[in-house]
């Protein structure tokens, strides 16, 4: 099986054309001389969890933010990396494949070779399993030739498993030592980058010389925080899904007799569903975050959709398209509680056929109410991160079944006057995640690969490659590196009334912000989407010409660029230091003190634990 990794692909004409496309580097990374600026130490976004994070990451917490600048940039204290000794770097894919992953490796390889042709890049075959077993493939120009700007992870393969246990961590360390690696680059999402942080801490503690770097690559779009604006693969996934959805919308409008229920891959968060809604304008989307915030039951959701169907029928519209995120099932309070009971029994070794009889009375009643196919799917063993196997639970069929039952009831009672309700169900996920990457994902991933090299060249450990100002062209991107521990939060698990909760620092999936601009845009258009059939077809992925440079709606409407703002703040502070120094006038000093007192008072209130939202 290992012999299949890294072999040349058979490429179509379009794939060949794409393999010749070379992404543009931002000015700060062009050439062989890059300046790195390390300034103030980072801190946790949630002050209440800082003590716990420090305790878990004593060696890698509180490291400074890194900015990569042009060699000509005149910035105090920024260092030019002049020496580039030959280094050995390992790279692996962790988690589900996401379009653009290959370009991270391509960018890393190019950066390694341009700075020292003797540098070596080793790819681990089969993800973390290949890391533990020390199965490697040397990445060369020949190996990369047919994987540039291509989808999938088939150059190296991947794994879903975490690097969690002591045995696994020790195996990873043994591999890095045996292969004499100066750096280890882990490409993945929330879980994989949490693992990268723990590995980096362990390596620092044991004086292992390997530096660990994480890269934000996940189709779910849920590795988002103040440092990370977007994830490699999300742009492609949403564009491919949006075309499929809009095709279905056109079909629904043509036949005028079907309701399509479409479940979208994306794990617990609803980012993919929200973005696809903003791109294709289906009639309705049920976001998991809305359901959780309003504590909607499965019956509430059913009634909500049925009321929408009835409202459309009153406008002589007996068709529609409804999007559902795959994480919706875990957002429904009573179903989530049922899953927790089932998973607890599975962990105790109770066989699936015996679980129903051991559930609590209310859970048993809900379980028996559900259709047989859903009961069977809920009994699947949880993933390695203890979440349900969401891609295997056909939520769209469950919701369609419940809606159809209710609509037939209303039809019989005479409260619904429309045509007989007909549902067609789809699950979109696998169709998109192996797609050719969009131009944005090709560019973003390639540049992140270069950033990984500069992180290692600067001797940094426990960092994630980050780029901000992404909604603008690549020549305006801000490249840097952020300590992964600074992105962590502490999730608290209550252990009953009066019991102390336990804190586990980790990267937690970012959910859709119901106060954010993307959700606001959806809310403003929800009624129009529901009743007016303003379906929008963005068409297939474009690699050149109109549409090629289009970016995710959610990326463009949010006002981000954290690194750029940090830089701007530092410039202001530097100006203050230049103006206010011993010898300045009393008026200048008094004005500075007054302004600073006001600013610090405001910031103290905003940053207090009570005003910081904490994930629970």
Swiss-Prot record:
Single GO BP term: photosynthesis
One of the record's GO cellular component terms: cytoplasm
Keyword match Transferase: yes
Pfam families for the chain: PFK
Pathways involved: Carbohydrate degradation; glycolysis; D-glyceraldehyde 3-phosphate and glycerone phosphate from D-glucose: step 3/4
Example of a GO MF term: metal ion binding
Cystine bridges: none
Residues spanning the signal sequence: none
Localization per Swiss-Prot or TrEMBL: Cytoplasm
Keyword tRNA-binding: no
Regulation affecting activity: Allosterically activated by fructose 2,6-bisphosphate.
UniProt superkingdom: Eukaryota
Keywords carried by this UniProt record: Allosteric enzyme, Cytoplasm, Glycolysis, Kinase, Magnesium, Metal-binding, Transferase
Subunit and partners: Tetramer of two alpha (regulatory) and two beta (catalytic) chains.
HAMAP family recorded: Phosphofructokinase_II_Long
Function: Regulatory subunit of pyrophosphate--fructose 6-phosphate 1-phosphotransferase.
PANTHER family (UniProt xref): PYROPHOSPHATE--FRUCTOSE 6-PHOSPHATE 1-PHOSPHOTRANSFERASE, PYROPHOSPHATE--FRUCTOSE 6-PHOSPHATE 1-PHOSPHOTRANSFERASE SUBUNIT ALPHA
Protein family per UniProt: Belongs to the phosphofructokinase type A (PFKA) family. PPi-dependent PFK group II subfamily. Clade 'Long' sub-subfamily.
Protein's recorded name: Pyrophosphate--fructose 6-phosphate 1-phosphotransferase subunit alpha
Species of the source: Solanum tuberosum
């Amino acid at each position: 099986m290992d012999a299949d990794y890294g072999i040349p692909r058979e490429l179509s004409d379009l794939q060949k054309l794409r393999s010749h496309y070379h992404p543009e580097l931002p000015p700060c990374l062009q050439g062989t001389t890059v300046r790195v600026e390390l300034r103030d130490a980072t801190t946790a976004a949630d002050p209440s969890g800082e003590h716990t994070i420090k305790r878990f990451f004593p060696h890698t917490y509180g490291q400074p933010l890194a900015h990569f600048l042009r060699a000509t940039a005149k910035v105090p204290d920024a260092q030019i990396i002049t020496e580039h000794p030959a280094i050995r770097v390992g790279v692996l894919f962790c988690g589900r494949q996401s379009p653009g992953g290959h370009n991270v490796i391509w960018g890393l390889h190019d950066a390694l070779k341009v700075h020292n042709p003797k540098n070596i890049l080793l790819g681990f075959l089969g993800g973390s399993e290949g890391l533990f077993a020390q199965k490697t493939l040397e990445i060369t120009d020949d190996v990369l030739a047919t994987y540039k700007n291509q989808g999938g992870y088939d150059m190296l393969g991947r794994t879903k498993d975490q690097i969690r246990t002591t045995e696994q961590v020790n195996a990873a360390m043994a591999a890095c030592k045996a292969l004499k690696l100066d750096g280890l680059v882990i490409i993945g999402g929330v879980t994989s980058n949490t693992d990268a942080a723990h590995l980096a801490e362990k390596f620092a503690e044991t004086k292992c010389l390997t530096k660990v770097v994480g890269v934000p690559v996940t189709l779910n779009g849920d590795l988002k925080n103040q440092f990370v604006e977007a994830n490699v693969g999300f742009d492609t996934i949403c564009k491919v899904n949006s075309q499929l959805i809009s095709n279905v919308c056109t079909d629904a409008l043509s036949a005028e007799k079907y309701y399509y229920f479409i479940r979208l891959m994306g794990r617990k968060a609803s980012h993919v569903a929200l973005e696809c809604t903003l791109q294709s304008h289906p009639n309705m989307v049920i976001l998991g975050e809305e359901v959780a915030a309003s504590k909607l039951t499965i019956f509430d959701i059913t009634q909500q959709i049925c009321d929408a169907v009835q409202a459309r029928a009153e406008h002589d519209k007996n068709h529609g398209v409804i999007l559902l995120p795959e994480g919706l099932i875990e957002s429904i309070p009573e179903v989530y509680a049922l899953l927790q009971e089932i998973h607890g029994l599975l962990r105790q070794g109770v066989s699936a056929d015996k679980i129903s009889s051991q559930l609590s009375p209310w859970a048993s009643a809900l379980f028996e109410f559900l259709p047989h196919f859903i009961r069977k799917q809920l009994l699947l063993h949880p993933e390695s991160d203890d979440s349900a196997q969401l891609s295997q639970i056909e939520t769209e069929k469950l919701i369609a079944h419940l809606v159809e039952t209710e609509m037939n009831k209303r039809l019989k009672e005479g409260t619904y006057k429309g045509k007989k309700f007909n549902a067609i169900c789809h699950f979109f996920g696998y169709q998109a995640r192996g797609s050719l990457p969009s131009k944005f994902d090709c560019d973003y991933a390639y540049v992140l690969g270069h950033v990984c090299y500069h992180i290692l060249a600067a001797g940094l450990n426990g960092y994630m490659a980050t780029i901000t100002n992404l909604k603008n062209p690549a020549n305006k991107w801000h490249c840097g590196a952020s300590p992964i521990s600074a992105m962590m939060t502490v999730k608290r698990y209550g252990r009953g009334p009066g019991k102390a909760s336990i804190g586990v620092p980790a990267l937690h999936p970012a959910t859709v912000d119901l106060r954010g601009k993307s959700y606001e845009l959806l809310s403003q258009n929800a009624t129009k989407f529901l009743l007016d059939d303003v379906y929008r077809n963005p068409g297939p992925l474009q690699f050149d010409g109109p549409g090629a440079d289009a970016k995710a709606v959610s990326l463009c409407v949010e006002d981000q660029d954290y690194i750029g703002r940090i830089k701007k703040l530092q410039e202001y502070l530097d100006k203050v230091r230049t103006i206010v120094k011993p010898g300045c006038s009393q008026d200048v000093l008094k004005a500075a003190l007054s302004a600073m007192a006001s600013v610090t008072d405001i910031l103290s209130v905003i940053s207090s634990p009570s005003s910081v939202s904490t994930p629970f």
